[in-house]
Amino acid sequence: MDSKDQTMFYNFGDDSIEEDVKKLMKQVYVALEEKGYNPVNQIVGYLLSGDPAYIPRHKDARSLIRRLERDEIIEELVKAYLKNNEIGEK
């Protein structure tokens, strides 16, 4: 069997970043709203591209969002979505 056909496991290991991500996302969201941007569109643009230009410097939002790896933010967003929609672990 080709190794590309096998499922790979991805484990971040540390679940303690949930509160860090939550606090950071709130701050970035507020900064984006205050500047008149659509926060969801801008955050998605940053997470997909890695380009910090999607996040303004207002209220130090650009520096804040770069403190965490994008994959850590995405992991927490997916976990929150699944939990809020009662999908997966109870």
Curated annotation (Swiss-Prot):
It holds the Pfam family IreB. It comes from the Bacteria. Belongs to the UPF0297 family. This is UPF0297 protein lwe1516. It comes from Listeria welshimeri serovar 6b (strain ATCC 35897 / DSM 20650 / CCUG 15529 / CIP 8149 / NCTC 11857 / SLCC 5334 / V8).
